[in-house]
């Protein structure tokens, strides 16, 4: 299995099984499995996970904290018709074991809570400039391939792999898509209104990081205020960004 392809293979496969006559409880268990794959990918841990799989002995026991999820995946795997699907499902079970053995069960639980809410995805790092981001990436002993980071308040995905150095980062329109979807659905009432950007920034600086996001107005114009708790980062985005 090519590890870089694992998330793109596993998440759609699990989603397909969720639509295939499972009970509500079973669908929720597959949500945990799907979230585990996404958590590993978007936090830049694919290569660490790959190394973990390589070093694991065959016939290893399931992760104790995820017994129900693993039992369901094993049942689905037994019934799967293709060797490729069986391999992917085994890798998903290994993903759960990796998360538990590396002490990241709480991190996964927090990530799953993000999945259940309408908010922006978390990032693992935030930088003011491209050069700061490149320096940080050069210092990583293992490329955090797939991780989300902020560079100048813009979402980027880490694309440096073990085989390829460039491109280091790829910009992704996460903010624009989030704003665009809310403009289509209709904005919620603003939680605060300010005359100037300075007033709004002062308010945001004292807003709990757990707020995640809020819609406000500055000079009568709608803005999105975002807090990234993990990296202690706050930012304001004018809603016109989605139209650019």
Predicted regions and their residues:
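Short amphipathic alpha-helical heptad-repeat segments
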Residues: 2-12, 29, 62-70, 88
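Long, non-catalytic architectural segments outside compact domain cores
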Residues: 9-12, 20, 52, 213-215, ...
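Amphipathic alpha-helical packing elements
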Residues: 26-57, 81-117
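N-terminal intrinsically disordered, low-complexity, charge/repeat-rich segments that act as generic
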Residues: 65-69, 76-82, 95, 102, ...
């Amino acid at each position: 299995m090519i590890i870089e392809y694992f998330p793109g293979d596993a998440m759609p496969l699990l989603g397909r099984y969720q639509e295939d006559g499972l009970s509500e409880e079973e669908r929720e268990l597959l949500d945990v499995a799907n979230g585990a794959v996404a958590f590993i990918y978007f936090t830049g841990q694919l290569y660490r996970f790959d190394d973990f799989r390589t070093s694991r002995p065959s016939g290893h026991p399931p992760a104790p904290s995820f017994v129900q999820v693993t039992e369901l995946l094993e049942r689905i795997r037994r019934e799967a018709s293709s060797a490729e699907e069986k391999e992917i499902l085994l890798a998903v079970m290994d993903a759960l074991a990796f998360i538990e053995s590396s002490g990241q069960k709480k991190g996964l639980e927090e990530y799953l809570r993000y999945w259940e809410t309408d908010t922006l995805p978390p990032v693992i790092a935030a930088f003011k400039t491209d050069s700061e981001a490149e320096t940080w990436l050069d210092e990583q002993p293992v490329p955090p391939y797939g991780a989300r980071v902020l560079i100048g308040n813009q979402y980027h995905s880490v694309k440096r792999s073990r085989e390829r150095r460039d491109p280091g980062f790829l910009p992704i329109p996460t903010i624009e898509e989030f704003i665009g979807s809310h403009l289509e659905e209709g904005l919620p009432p603003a939680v605060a209104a300010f005359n100037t950007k300075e007033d709004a920034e002062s308010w945001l600086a004292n807003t709990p990081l757990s707020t995640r996001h809020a819609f406000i107005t500055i000079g009568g114009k709608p803005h999105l205020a975002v807090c990234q708790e993990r990296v202690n980062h706050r930012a304001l985005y004018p809603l016109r960004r989605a139209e650019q």
